[in-house]
């Protein structure tokens, strides 16, 4: 069964288009290289966002977690963002 991780982020500054482009060009490929099959970054407010990462299964997601922790640390530093929360689980229904 597929496995999803969701992380919620906040920053003191409004994210610029340049920041969003950097995330698209740099961080999404890093997450995929860690094992994700797909990644979406969602702007949830002017100063908040979330990252949804899809994995083939829980084993793949678990194997990626050390690398994901490094990527999250780098994103926090590069964008002066704070990781607010992170959640994960197996997909129980899909359409």
Per-range role (PLM):
Residues 1-50, 54-70, 77-95:
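Short S/T/G/P-rich N-terminal loop/turn motif that feeds into the first structured element of a domain
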């Amino acid at each position: 069964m597929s496995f999803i991780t969701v992380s919620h982020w906040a920053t003191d500054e409004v994210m610029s288009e340049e920041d969003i482009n950097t995330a698209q060009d740099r961080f999404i490929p890093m997450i995929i290289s860690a094992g994700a099959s797909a990644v979406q970054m969602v702007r949830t407010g002017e100063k908040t966002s979330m990252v949804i990462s899809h994995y083939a299964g829980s084993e793949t997601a678990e194997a990626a977690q050390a690398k994901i922790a490094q990527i999250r640390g780098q994103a926090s530093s590069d964008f002066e963002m704070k990781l607010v929360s992170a959640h994960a689980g197996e997909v129980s229904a899909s359409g």
